[in-house]
């Protein structure tokens, strides 16, 4: 008898290849050191995670520009060119998801730290997201799942 009834997938980095590097590597002319400095000091992961927890991207961008006006153009790109950060599905993981769904042995849901403002773009781009019985999006719930 199978004791596992439910399977939970994360999305970013598991089923979907997302990275700001796809935008900023070009903007920094391949200079990884400068790009990483920008991530560590201007558009930080903590800053992005705040939007994943439901904070307005527009407000967050405006506030960040006030803090770092010299970087206005680059800050605006973070959400202004967000679609370019969203690449392809991760084939092996999607294949596994499809096999699990086809088996009809499990309830399969997704749990993701993702902004409610950008998640509809992912839904439109990735048809496999319709395979889930439910998707819990941190930005819709106004909280994030912990990383530690």
Question: Where are the language model's segments positioned?
Answer:
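Active-site neighborhood of HAD-like aspartate-dependent phosphohydrolases
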Residues: 1-43
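Short, solvent-exposed loop/turn segments at secondary-structure junctions
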Residues: 14-15, 20-22, 114-118, 141-143
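Substrate-recognition "cap/lid" segment bordering the active-site pocket of phosphatases
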Residues: 116-148
């Amino acid at each position: 008898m199978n004791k596992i009834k439910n399977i939970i997938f994360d999305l970013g980095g598991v089923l979907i290849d997302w990275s700001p590097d796809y935008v900023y590597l070009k903007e920094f002319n391949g200079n990884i050191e400068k790009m990483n400095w920008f991530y560590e000091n201007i558009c930080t992961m903590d800053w992005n995670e705040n939007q994943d927890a439901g904070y307005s991207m527009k407000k967050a961008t405006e506030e960040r520009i006030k803090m770092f006006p010299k970087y206005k153009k680059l800050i605006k790109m973070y959400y202004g060119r967000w679609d370019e950060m969203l690449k392809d599905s991760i084939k092996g993981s999607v294949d596994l998801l499809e096999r699990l769904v086809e088996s009809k042995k499990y309830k399969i849901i997704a749990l993701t730290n993702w902004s409610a403002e950008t998640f509809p773009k992912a839904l439109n781009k990735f048809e496999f997201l319709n395979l889930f019985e439910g998707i819990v999006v941190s930005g819709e719930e106004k909280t994030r799942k912990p990383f530690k």
